[in-house]
C-alpha cells in the first residue's frame, strides 16, 4: 500500500465502511469488504496472475488479514461473475471458514464448485439470478443482469441502514449480445430514482472514448477466416468466454468442420457451460484431440487456451513442439481471439514468433476484428452515470490512469468532486448520512501462492531486488507434529527492514503467545499455524513501525 494513512477509527454508529482488499490500481485480486453494524459482507474474491518480476509465483491473492480476525462476522460472499480475478481466491478464504455462504448466479457457482473440488472444499451455495433479492443479516442484496465476456454476470445493489450501494462488477452495455441478455440499465436507473448513495464502478475502459463494439461483430470475422483457411484452424480465447466459443463453433459447423477443445480449463468450462445450457453444440460436432489429429486438416477447428503466452498453456506448448497430442505444421491458421493484457507482451510475442517460425499464419486483433472487450467504454459509462445518478462514486477495477479517467467521467455528469473517492487497496471509505469520505487504511500486501507447495498461502521471496526494496521478516517455528506444541523459541530474521538486532524481540514474544493460543484452540495444521504467525507478526510490525514488509513464515514439524 503506497498511501500513508492511519488505521480507520471506530465506524460511526449506523454508518457503512467499504474497504477494497484488492482490485484497485491493478486488474485482478478483486475483493471488497462492506461493514455495517459490526457485520461484514464481501463482494468477490479473486486472484491476480504474477508478472515477470515475480518468479516462482503461480497466483497472487488479496491480503485477507483484515477479515481473518473477524471470520464469524462475515454474513456472505457475493459474486459478480465467474472470472478468475473475481473467484480465484475463494478456496483460500473458505479454508479459513468453510461455511461462509457463497452467493452467485448459476454459471458462476458452477465454476466455483469446480475450483473448490480441487481443494476438497464443499461450499455453502446460494444461487440467484437477476431480479431476485436476498438478505444476509443487516445486508439486503438485489441483482441486475450485466453483459460481460462470461455468462450470467451480475451487478449488485447492497441495501443497508446507511444507504444504498451499487457495485457494477465488470460491466458492458452491448446492445446486441449473442446471448440476448443485455445489461439492465433500466433497472439500475430505477434504482437511481430511489437514490444510490455510493456507486462502485468498473474503470477498465474508462479512458477509451465512445461505445465499444458488440461481441456479435466477432462472429462474421471468425466465419470469414475459417472459410478462407485451407488447413487446420486453431482459435485461442479465454476459457470463460462462452459467447466467443459459441461463435467459433457456429462458424466451424456451418463450414463443415468439427470442433475439439484443448486445454484443461477450456475443457472444464465448456463442459460446465454445456451442462447448464449456456453452450449449444451437438455431440456429433465435437471430437477429442486424438481424433482431431487423425482428421484432414480442413475438417477441424481446435479451440484452445493460451492467449496470454502462459508457459504451460496448450498454445504455448504447441508453439514449442511440446504438446503431447498436437503437432503444428506450416499452413495452420492460428487466431488469437483475445486482448493483450498489459505485462504479457513479451510472452505473447514470443509465442507468436515461435508459431511464425513453424510457418503457421497468425491473426490477432491488429489484423482483423477477432476480439472485443467485455468492459464498457467511456460513452457507455456516461449512460450509466446519467441513469444511476449516484451521490458518491468510488472507481474500482483499474490502474491509476483508468481510475482517474472514470473519476473524470463521474464529474462530467455532475457528481461533486469531493464526492468522488479515489481510493487504494486497503483504504477505507465510510458512508455516513449520505456523505462518503476516506477514514483511514488497513495494512494490505500481496499474498502469494507457490505452486511447488500445494495450497500454501503466504508471502514468499521473489528475488533479492524485491526483498531489498520492500524488506522482509522471516519467522521460523518448530512444532510437534500432530499437536502444534512449540519445541523451541521462534526465530525471527529481517532484511531491508530494521538494522537493530533487538528490534524483533517483542515480536518473538508475540509469536510465542500466538503459538500457545493455537495449541489451546487445537490448531495443528501447519498452514493454519503459518497463517497465524504471519498475521501476528504483520499486525505487530504495522502497529509498531507502520510498515508492511514481507512476512515469510516457516513451520517445521518434528
Swiss-Prot record:
The gene is rnj. This is Ribonuclease J. Its main location: cytoplasm. Pfam families: Lactamase_B_2 (PF12706), RMMBL (PF07521), RNase_J_b_CASP (PF22505), RNase_J_C (PF17770). Belongs to the metallo-beta-lactamase superfamily. RNA-metabolizing metallo-beta-lactamase-like family. Bacterial RNase J subfamily. Keywords: Cytoplasm, Endonuclease, Exonuclease, Hydrolase, Isopeptide bond, Metal-binding, Nuclease, RNA-binding, rRNA processing, Ubl conjugation, Zinc. Gene3D superfamilies: 3.10.20.580, Metallo-hydrolase/oxidoreductase, Ribonuclease Z/Hydroxyacylglutathione hydrolase-like. GO terms for cellular component: cytoplasm. It is an enzyme of class 3 (hydrolase). HAMAP family: RNase_J_bact. Residues 451-558 are annotated as: Required for beta-lactamase activity. Substrate binds at residues 371-375. It comes from the Bacteria. Zn(2+) 1 binds at residues 81, 83, 148, 170. Binds up to 2 Zn(2+) ions per subunit. It is not clear if Zn(2+) or Mg(2+) is physiologically important. Residues 1-269 are annotated as: Not absolutely required for RNase activity. Its cofactor is Zn(2+). It is found in: Cytoplasm. GO terms for molecular function: 5'-3' RNA exonuclease activity; beta-lactamase activity; RNA binding; RNA endonuclease activity; zinc ion binding. Changing residue 184 to A: Significantly decreased beta-lactamase and RNase activity.
